[in-house]
Amino acid sequence: LGSTTMNWVRQGPGXGLEWLVSYYGPSKNAYAPEIKDRFTASKDTSNNIFALDMKSLKTEDTAIYYCVGQRNYYYFDFWGQGTMVTVTA
C-alpha cells in the first residue's frame, strides 16, 4: 500500500458507484457526508491492510464495497474484488 492513496467506494443494488472515503494519512482523510460519523478507514502498511470500520449500519448501506488504490490524481489504478454487505431491518 505504501504511499498509495486508498479509497472505499460502494455500489448499492441497481445503483451506480458511490465514493465513500479517500485515505491520505492517519489524520488526512476525506469522507462522504452520509457516512462521515459512522465509518472509519484505516491503513496498516506493514501488513498491506486497508480496512473500513462500519457502525450504526442502515438498510441503505447494503452494497458491494470496493477498496480502490489511486497512484494517479485523476483515476483509480486498481480495485479489490469487492465484498457484499447486506443490512437487514
UniProtKB/Swiss-Prot annotation:
Residues 8-21 are annotated as: Framework-2. Residues 38-69 are annotated as: Framework-3. GO terms for biological process: adaptive immune response. Residues 74-89 are annotated as: J segment homolog. The keyword Transmembrane does not apply. Transmembrane segments: none annotated. Residues 3-7 are annotated as: Complementarity-determining-1. Residues 70-73 are annotated as: D segment homolog. Residues 1-69 are annotated as: V segment. Residues 1-2 are annotated as: Framework-1. Keywords: Adaptive immunity, Immunity, Immunoglobulin. Residues 22-37 are annotated as: Complementarity-determining-2. GO terms for cellular component: extracellular region; immunoglobulin complex. InterPro entries: Ig-like_dom_sf, Ig-like_fold, Ig_V-set, IgHV. This is Ig heavy chain V region HC-3. It comes from Heterodontus francisci.
